[in-house]
Amino acid sequence: MNKQKFYTNLSKEVSYALRHAQWKYELELDENGWVSVEQLLHALHQSIEWRDVKIEDLKIMIEKSEKKRHELKENKIRALYGHSIPMKIVKEEGVPPEFLYHGTSPRFLNSIESNGLSPMSRQYVHLSEDIITAELVGKRKDKHPIILEVNTGKAREEGVKFYLGNEKVWLADEIPSEFIAINKN
């Protein structure tokens, strides 16, 4: 692929991630639409096509773009327009559905069974309201993800707090392993 085509395709991928599918890429945008470059690169690196993308590539992508679609400031990036879903993820405590789902690679299962779900490089653990969404997120990490089911009722009884993310995503600080099961569906 020639360089111009590479940067055009990268711009489309970054736009999709920042404007329309933060939930799929597990990105946490602030109230002004900014996300850390580190978090975006981590999400992009889940795909073989974007595994080698570096901050320098994002800078070149922005410079070469005819239309200014993205802005890079310090170690944060944002899309300048065209968002189809709300940008702000407000940490507002809420009562989630009885079960939430998390898609991940089978290689992480032993650690999750021992230690539960933790946010890793993010601020929160991301959980989906439905299995399909969890599977889409999980497929960014593994072609054949496992879907974990979180019993939110029992977790809330033990003090786990859940926060509203957006229409598809709930957030939590962490989920202890006793509230997690493998979804068999």
UniProtKB/Swiss-Prot annotation:
Q: Broadest EC class?
A: transferase
- GO function term, MF aspect, one: tRNA 2'-phosphotransferase activity
Source domain of life is Bacteria
Record's keyword annotation contains NAD: yes
Print the keywords alphabetically. NAD, Transferase
GO biological process terms, alphabetically, are: tRNA splicing, via endonucleolytic cleavage and ligation
The Enzyme Commission number assigned here is 2.7.1.-
What SUPFAM superfamilies has UniProt attached to this entry? ADP-ribosylation
Into which family does the record put it?
A: Belongs to the KptA/TPT1 family.
Give the function comment from the record. Answer: Removes the 2'-phosphate from RNA via an intermediate in which the phosphate is ADP-ribosylated by NAD followed by a presumed transesterification to release the RNA and generate ADP-ribose 1''-2''-cyclic phosphate (APPR>P). May function as an ADP-ribosylase.
Q: What name appears for this protein in its UniProt entry? A: Probable RNA 2'-phosphotransferase
Source species, please?
Bacillus thuringiensis subsp. konkukian (strain 97-27)
Native organism taxonomy: Bacteria, Bacillati, Bacillota, Bacilli, Bacillales
